A protein has these predicted regions:
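Short beta-strand micro-motifs in enzyme catalytic cores
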Residues: 18, 33, 94-98
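Short, acidic/hydrophobic/Gly-rich beta-strand patch recurrent on exposed beta strands
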Residues: 35-38
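Unchanged
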Residues: 52-140
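Acidic, metal-coordinating catalytic segment for phosphate/diphosphate chemistry
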Residues: 1-23, 29
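A short, flexible beta-alpha/helix-coil linker loop
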Residues: 42-44
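Conserved beta-strand and immediately adjacent loop positions that scaffold enzyme active sites
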Residues: 21, 33, 116
Length: 142
């Protein structure tokens, strides 16, 4: 779905939810690390992401969602592709992803949406992530 379109667009009788998120990487003591988040509502480990606001570009959505969920202000480094799946409400969802680098830590505050963050090695992330689609995304950007 093109940037700047409505969050969800009717395609016949199917509504596709548009979202964006980030794979945030840094150099750590054990090499390259990536940030994963725990969502208590689903009891899952994934990458930070969320639905786009109407009129919001995918890039702006990804940066906003990462900031809201993690407290990190980031720089987009490169596009990381797209994942498509059916969400918990049964709607088709398309998520555009970017590799990001943290610039500033605005402070994480655990909340109902994300209650824990972990910086983990790429190998540990592959074991911790709940969804195969996230592991496949991680493999594409190694």
């Amino acid at each position: 779905m093109a940037e700047g379109m409505e969050t969800a667009r009717a395609l016949g009788d199917v509504t596709v939810v548009r979202a964006a998120g980030g794979l945030i990487r840094r150099s750590g003591a054990q090499g390259r690390e990536v940030l994963v988040v725990h969502r208590p509502r689903y009891d899952d480990w994934t990458f930070p992401k969320g639905k786009a606001d109407d009129g919001e570009s995918d890039e702006d959505c990804a940066l906003r969602e990462v900031d809201e969920e993690t407290g990190l202000h980031c720089l987009l480094e490169s596009a990381a592709g797209m994942t498509e799946y059916v969400d918990a409400k049964g709607r088709p969802k398309r998520v555009r992803w970017w590799v990001m680098r943290p610039l500033e830590d605005g402070g994480f505050i655990p909340n109902d949406e994300v209650d824990e963050l972990r910086w983990v090695t790429l190998a540990d992330a592959a074991r911790l992530l709940t969804y195969d689609r996230d592991v496949a995304l991680l493999d594409r950007v190694r």
